[in-house]
Amino acid sequence: MNAALFAYSRRGCATARRIMAALADWDIQPYTMERFAEDGFAPLGRPAREFYGPIFGDVQAMIFVSSVGLAVREVAPHLKSKATDPAVLVLDELGQYVIPVLSGHIGGANELAKALAASLGAQAVITTATDINGRFSVDAWAVQNGCAIASLPLAKAVSAAVLEGDVPFLSDFPVVTDLPRGLAPGDAGALGVYVGVYEKTPFAKTLRLVPRVVRLGIGCRKGTDEETIRAAVNEALAAHGIDRRAVKCAASIDLKAEEAGLLAYCRSEGLSAEFYTADELRAVRGEFTPSEFVKSITGVDNVCERAALRNAETLLVKKTARSGVTVAAAAEHWEVRFA
């Protein structure tokens, strides 16, 4: 985690040092006025608009030891989206109050404020309605559980609806704790929350929360390019109604560990790449689509299905083939939990 920390007075710098001690596992760059710039503090640059902009887009949190007004004026020109803006927090220079100003849920500002307040002996000033009313916060839960939010406008609608009553909730994964206030089991209604990897819409307006638990198994001819692999994967997922945001990994046999097109596909899609030996793939249990030709080349009767299941639980997509690329997909074990 990385953050930029801003202080504008000598006393503010003292509080900034306490913040850095509290967040010792963070990568934090502190800034202050040039006359106070010492002990690792970098001088604030000018003009302000040009100085804060690049920092805003490069950190996960911006922490101001200042007035709220100063912080708001400095970050306002750089706001883009609640999906991408960093957490913005303000502390008074005595470190008595910690105020999350921006990205309280998706950016994690609320949780960071609570953690800082506990460490500093300060008061976290939380103003988001779901938090102060003890209701389910859909965007915070999604971030904490590694789920993509399919629609931010619908997330906003759900956040408003849980303040008025219970919103129906449906999950393809086992729910192993009680539902929080604001959610109730249901599979129909005007507005509801669905947790799963499929692009299903059980409610008239369905907010889909997509856990990243799908592992691809990919086989391909030598020299297959990135776009051919992407087209084969997208076709296989679309045919089974699987949201691409659910994919976390692509796996294959170790003979493909240097396959440029496959590696390029993984990089561009933000996927980890895993490669297994023929012995490791043969050890995977299940019913697979065999190929004597593949076995003669690789030593194992099926690469894509076995690779997908090597560290997963349920095969979602059996072997599909397109343009010399074979694709399978499997889901890891996953559970829905509410604190």
For each of these PLM feature ranges, what is it?
Residues 1-5:
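Extreme N-terminal starter segment of soluble prokaryotic enzymes
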Residues 119-121, 129, 297-312:
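Helix-rich interaction surfaces within compact, conserved domain-sized segments
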Residues 11-28, 34-36, 43-47, 54-110, ...:
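Conserved mixed alpha/beta catalytic, RNA-binding, or beta-rich assembly cores of soluble enzyme
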Residues 194-202, 206-210, 304-339:
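C-terminal edge-of-domain segments
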Residues 51, 76, 313-315:
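Short secondary-structure capping/turn segments at boundaries of alpha-helices and beta-strands
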